A protein has these predicted regions:
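Short beta-strand-to-loop element that shapes/binds the nucleotide-sugar donor at the catalytic cleft/hinge
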Residues: 115-130
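Short, acidic, metal-binding catalytic loop of nucleotide-sugar glycosyltransferases
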Residues: 19-29
């Protein structure tokens, strides 16, 4: 399996992601491709020191965030020579040494499965789900617009059969990474089962907006939300983030 990780200016988060991957993986079973999106900072300097990954540095002149991310994935796919390819974010953190066998088992469950993945890797409390449904019902009653996006595999965790990916236009197609690819594979008759958040969370976590925690200079409404910051800090504590960031041996 090849693991693709795009990087852009997130030193500590990139360290946490890659070190957790190293900590919970038999690296003789995977190849790790990190595509740096013209960071020109300490994060790419750090990546250059890692002998256990393959680092590709690309220029991103005129590219916005979503395009930059998707094009990085497409560049990486040109180098993939394994049967399976997993794409993750730098805020995807492994927490179990069984994650690899878990995902392989999912994608090999049937021959017509082209990929498995996640829409949102977050466990939502039942009460919050209940009130969200009430809110949606009321909005429909009042004739207000409801955002009803079609789900696809988001790139914080998406495992594909490499040959299936090559039957599409790739990750970049003027939309978020993987949107059109998911639709093309589905139209070709492939199965694309989603992994429930509650199940996937036993193997890895996706730290939504963690950049605002580890890189407090980022300016965003989310970074100024004390409740979300407290929640993320608690999650980082549960993942023993400080211990992992302090363990330089995981880079060797």
């Amino acid at each position: 399996m090849t693991v693709i990780v795009p990087n852009y200016k997130t030193l500590d988060l990139t360290k946490l992601c890659l070190r957790s991957l190293r900590k919970y993986t038999d690296c003789s079973r995977i190849k790790v491709l990190v595509i740096d999106n013209d960071s020109c900072d300490e994060s790419v300097e750090y990546l250059r020191t890692l002998e256990w990954i393959t680092l590709v540095e690309r220029k991103t002149t005129g590219e916005g965030g979503p395009e930059m991310h998707a094009r990085a994935l497409d560049m990486a796919m040109e180098m993939v020579d394994t049967e399976l390819v997993l794409v993750i974010h730098t805020d995807t953190i492994m927490i179990s040494d069984k994650w690899l066998d878990f995902l392989i088992g999912k994608i090999n469950a049937a021959p017509d499965i082209a990929g498995v993945g996640s829409w949102k890797l977050e466990v939502v409390p039942p009460l919050k789900v209940f009130f969200k449904r009430i809110e949606t019902f009321i909005r429909r009653l009042l004739g207000r617009k409801i955002l009803d996006r079609e789900h696809y595999f988001r790139s914080h965790c998406a495992l594909y059969k490499s040959e299936a990916v090559r039957q599409t236009n790739g990750f970049y197609d003027n939309e978020s990474a993987g949107v059109r690819m998911f639709a093309i594979l589905r139209d070709k008759g492939y199965k694309l089962p989603f992994i429930e958040s509650e199940e996937l969370a036993g193997y890895m976590r996706h730290l939504n907006h963690a950049t605002m925690i580890l890189h407090p200079s980022s300016q965003s409404r989310k970074s100024s939300n004390p409740a979300k910051l407290r929640k993320l800090n608690k999650e980082l504590e549960k993942l023993h983030a400080r211990e992992i960031l302090a363990d330089d041996s995981l880079d060797k």
